[in-house]
Amino acid sequence: MVIFTDLDGTLLNHEDYSFKDAIPSLERIKKKGIPLVIVTSKTKKEVELIQKELGIEEPFIVENGAAVFFPKGYRGFNIRCDQENRYCIIKLGRDYREIRDFIEKIKDKFKIKGFGDMTVEEIVRLTDLPYDRAELAKERDFTEPFIIEDEKDIKDLEEIAEKEGFKITKGGRFYHLIGKGQDKGRAVQIVKKVFEENYGEVPLTVGLGDSRNDIPMLREVDIPILIPHINKKYESVNLPGIIKAEYPGSKGWNESIWRILNEIERGCC
């Protein structure tokens, strides 16, 4: 079994970024040795810090599917990848410089502002992140979160981005300019393939997310779980068999994983 999870609004509460209510299920999956693969729009440095707080060292997917990071020597797996420092990396995204070049070309016309245009203080105000975390959020490698003055312009912006080899996805707080060849679903496919090649079979997969950019991930797992937004409303997802958690954030995450583990132990899945 492999669990794939979004962070903000899913494992982490939207309002305070806490995973406190998910600790019972987190401890349970750790004891069982179940891999917990983070799939997020956050940066590598942000995820490294969160993994340390969670007490895990597992594969993770950053910046909306831009790259997959496996710890070197992970479970003795044989993985075709780029070796960099402590990681075995599979890259799907565009270089951040290319992303910024495109932003510079169109930002005045569409009145958009990306993280690269913002001070750390501005990011703190928009995200409620502590200053040191906002600094890590600004250190990007592949994608750009941005705000736009008039959301009616998004469709026109999407068309121009498409012609340049980019696309736009929507997270819980921001729009994101990303490479055309990436999304969370494609990155999840890669992780599943690595486990299959090394285990000899495809493991049962569970995915949890709350936003539009999580839909590609949810389409790639056996058990997709949709976490409600903080206002108790759900993202519109047309996906057969999707499970809707009752509560937002870490409480809904905990309840959903606890129930799935119970069902598996009873032989229901």
UniProtKB/Swiss-Prot annotation:
<dbReference type="GO" id="GO:0050897">
    <property type="term" value="F:cobalt ion binding"/>
</dbReference>
<dbReference type="GO" id="GO:0000287">
    <property type="term" value="F:magnesium ion binding"/>
</dbReference>
<dbReference type="InterPro" id="IPR006381">
    <property type="entry name" value="HAD-SF-IIB-MPGP"/>
</dbReference>
<dbReference type="GO" id="GO:0051479">
    <property type="term" value="P:mannosylglycerate biosynthetic process"/>
</dbReference>
<feature type="binding site">
    <location>
        <position position="210"/>
    </location>
    <ligand>
        <name>Mg(2+)</name>
    </ligand>
</feature>
<dbReference type="InterPro" id="IPR023214">
    <property type="entry name" value="HAD_sf"/>
</dbReference>
<dbReference type="GO" id="GO:0016791">
    <property type="term" value="F:phosphatase activity"/>
</dbReference>
<keyword id="KW-0378">Hydrolase</keyword>
<dbReference type="InterPro" id="IPR036412">
    <property type="entry name" value="HAD-like_sf"/>
</dbReference>
<comment type="similarity">
    <text>Belongs to the HAD-like hydrolase superfamily. MPGP family.</text>
</comment>
<comment type="function">
    <text>Involved in the biosynthesis of glucosylglycerate. Catalyzes the dephosphorylation of glucosyl-3-phosphoglycerate (GPG) and mannosyl-3-phosphoglycerate (MPG) to glucosylglycerate (GG) and mannosylglycerate (MG), respectively.</text>
</comment>
<dbReference type="InterPro" id="IPR006379">
    <property type="entry name" value="HAD-SF_hydro_IIB"/>
</dbReference>
<protein>
    <recommendedName>
        <fullName>Glucosyl-3-phosphoglycerate/mannosyl-3-phosphoglycerate phosphatase</fullName>
        <ecNumber>3.1.3.70</ecNumber>
        <ecNumber>3.1.3.85</ecNumber>
    </recommendedName>
</protein>
<keyword id="KW-0460">Magnesium</keyword>
<dbReference type="GO" id="GO:0050531">
    <property type="term" value="F:mannosyl-3-phosphoglycerate phosphatase activity"/>
</dbReference>
<feature type="binding site">
    <location>
        <position position="8"/>
    </location>
    <ligand>
        <name>Mg(2+)</name>
    </ligand>
</feature>
<comment type="subunit">
    <text>Monomer.</text>
</comment>
<feature type="binding site">
    <location>
        <position position="6"/>
    </location>
    <ligand>
        <name>Mg(2+)</name>
    </ligand>
</feature>
<dbReference type="GO" id="GO:0005829">
    <property type="term" value="C:cytosol"/>
</dbReference>
<keyword id="KW-0479">Metal-binding</keyword>
<dbReference type="Pfam" id="PF08282">
    <property type="entry name" value="Hydrolase_3"/>
</dbReference>
<feature type="active site" description="Nucleophile">
    <location>
        <position position="6"/>
    </location>
</feature>
